[in-house]
Amino acid sequence: MSQDPVIIHTDGGCRPNPGPGGWGAVLRHREHVREMFGGEAAVTSNNRMELTAPIMALEALTRPVTVHLYTDSTYVRNGITKWVLGWERNGWMTAAKQPVKNVDLWQRLQAACARHQVEWFWVKGHSGIGDNELADELATRGLQEAVGLTTSSAGTSLR
């Protein structure tokens, strides 16, 4: 695994929730920066978009690396660091014996994390953290493009 971590900031959301949604991610490694975004024109949820962002970012990495992943979603951070192993052990049922919501994405995130050494961090959203703010802007762009307010429905840009 790489000694210099890849730093990833992610965000996702919907307008309204549920409704069309977008996700964004900023990946940094040394002097390299990659911006990613996408969206869903169909009805989705904030939580699904918050999960999609780290999945897409981790799946974009071409080799196993150390990752510091920042999210403003306690749902995502707690889910992957505290709850997912119990859900899996219980047949993807919650402690209340209800099916886990978004199980398809939790399983995909779990698989994406397995390729890398991922350390998860929670950050307060809209608090002036540059790459978190950029991930939010990218999620908005993904939403706008998904509903046809701009030209395409998913993209990647390099800075």
Swiss-Prot record:
Residue ranges annotated for the RNase H type-1 domain, each copy included: 2-144
Subunit structure: Monomer.
Listed Pfam families: RNase_H (PF00075)
Family of this protein: Belongs to the RNase H family.
Cofactor annotation remark: Binds 1 Mg(2+) ion per subunit. May bind a second metal ion at a regulatory site, or after substrate binding.
Positions annotated to bind Mg(2+) 1: 11, 50, 72
One of the GO biological process terms: DNA replication, removal of RNA primer
GO cellular component, one term: cytoplasm
Phylogenetic placement of the source organism: Bacteria, Bacillati, Actinomycetota, Actinomycetes, Mycobacteriales
Organism per entry: Mycolicibacterium smegmatis (strain ATCC 700084 / mc(2)155) (Mycobacterium smegmatis)
Catalysed reactions, as listed in the record: Endonucleolytic cleavage to 5'-phosphomonoester
Amino-acid positions noted as binding Mg(2+) 2 in the UniProt annotation, renumbered to this chain: 11, 136
Protein's UniProt name: Ribonuclease H
EC number: 3.1.26.4
UniProt KW keywords: Cytoplasm, Endonuclease, Hydrolase, Magnesium, Metal-binding, Nuclease
Keyword Transmembrane helix part of the UniProt annotation: no
Localization: Cytoplasm
InterPro entries to which the protein is assigned, alphabetical: RNase_H, RNaseH-like_sf, RNaseH_domain, RNaseH_sf, RNaseHI
Underlying gene: rnhA
